Design a protein with these regions (language model features):
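TPR/TPR-like (Sel1-like) alpha-helical repeat modules
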Residues: 1-8, 60-66, 92-98, 110-135
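Flexible helix-coil transition and linker loops at the boundaries of alpha-helical arrays
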Residues: 1-29, 59-62
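Residue-level signature for tetratricopeptide repeat
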Residues: 42, 75-77, 109-110
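Long, ordered, amphipathic alpha-helical scaffolds
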Residues: 106-210
Length: 210
């Protein structure tokens, strides 16, 4: 009802006809966006994932720049629902930017789809984009993440850090709870990559000596 009331107040001004796509840029429509985001978040908390996806998509239509970060939660929802087509389209919509909260759910998506090569590729891309990804995955695999939660800033997180990964884990727990062995698998992928690099470096050093 709150959303309906807020929408009725905006309709006479023509915002839904003239300003769709730029709702966050207009001060008069920002409160409506906040109400809709709260509803979006509540749908997820209630486990109404299909309805949450629909509301998330609508929010992105109203605000194409996504100032509220709806795309991140929407990506986790697509991964949860194993919706590869919409997940890839969403990533492309935002220029396929290598962001923590895009790459990790995409890795989970392909893990759930049993496409481990693609999942591993996204894990490696995550590791390249976020300097703390290896540390995070190792701690998650060893069930030691509690050691880092005290470091969280209550006023927000710094992108591409452990803080962002922990924030993501808490906000999208429904996804990560659905794949209890994912972190152990992802950590083993990065360990294998590190071992391979060390062996390659060792061989290169031996060849130089010869």
């Amino acid at each position: 009802r709150l959303m309906e009331t807020a929408a009725k107040q905006l309709e006479p001004e023509g915002y839904f006809k003239e300003d769709v796509g730029a709702f966050w840029e207009i001060l008069e429509t920002r409160p409506y966006m906040r109400v809709c985001y709260t509803y979006f978040d509540a749908l997820i908390s209630c486990g109404m994932m299909h309805r949450a996806i629909g509301e998330g998509q609508r929010l992105l239509e109203l605000c194409e720049n996504d100032n509220l970060g709806v795309r991140y939660q929407l990506m986790h929802l697509y991964a949860y629902m194993e919706d590869e087509m919409h997940a890839l389209a969403l990533h492309k919509q935002f220029d396929s930017y290598e962001e923590t909260q895009m790459l990790l759910p995409l890795a989970v998506l392909y893990y759930k789809l049993n496409q481990f090569d693609k999942a591993e590729d996204y894990i490696k891309r995550l590791s390249a984009a976020n300097k703390d990804a290896k540390k995070f995955l190792r701690a998650a695999a060893q069930e030691r993440l509690e050691d880092y939660f005290d470091q969280l800033n209550p006023f927000g997180y710094q992108p591409f850090t452990m803080e962002e990964l922990l924030e993501e884990l808490m906000k999208s727990s429904y996804l990560f709870d659905s794949v209890p062995y994912f972190f152990a698998w992802a950590n083993s992928c990065l360990r294998a990559q590190t071992t391979a690099k060390k062996k390659a470096a060792g061989k290169a050093g031996s060849n130089k000596k010869l």
